[in-house]
């Protein structure tokens, strides 16, 4: 973790997490987004993705984990982001 004064251009940090079936179901419950492309294997198999995918905002929420625990770390709250989802995130 870093204090804001310690941040420099070019610093980096990483965060990795495997999204499981349980994560998908929990995120659907929390967000209210029960789109069958996330929850229904048969429906998703007929979609452009070919199988179930994670919610885009579930993946985007990992920015909060990265900023709040790694760079800069404790106490950091980010207030804006702009996203373009280029590739689906599949389960596991």
Where are these regions (language model features)?
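Hot-dog-fold acyl-thioester-processing enzymes
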Residues: 1-80
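Active-site beta-strand->loop segment that positions catalytic residues and contacts the acyl thioester
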Residues: 80-92
């Amino acid at each position: 973790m870093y204090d804001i004064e310690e941040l420099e251009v070019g610093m980096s940090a990483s965060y990795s997490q495997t999204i499981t079936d349980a994560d998908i179901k929990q995120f659907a419950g929390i967000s209210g987004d029960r789109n069958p492309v996330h929850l229904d294997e048969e429906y998703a198999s007929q979609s452009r993705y070919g199988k179930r995918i994670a919610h885009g905002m579930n993946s985007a929420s990992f920015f909060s984990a990265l900023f709040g625990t790694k760079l800069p770390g404790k106490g950091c709250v980010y207030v804006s982001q702009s996203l373009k989802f280029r590739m689906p995130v599949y389960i596991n």
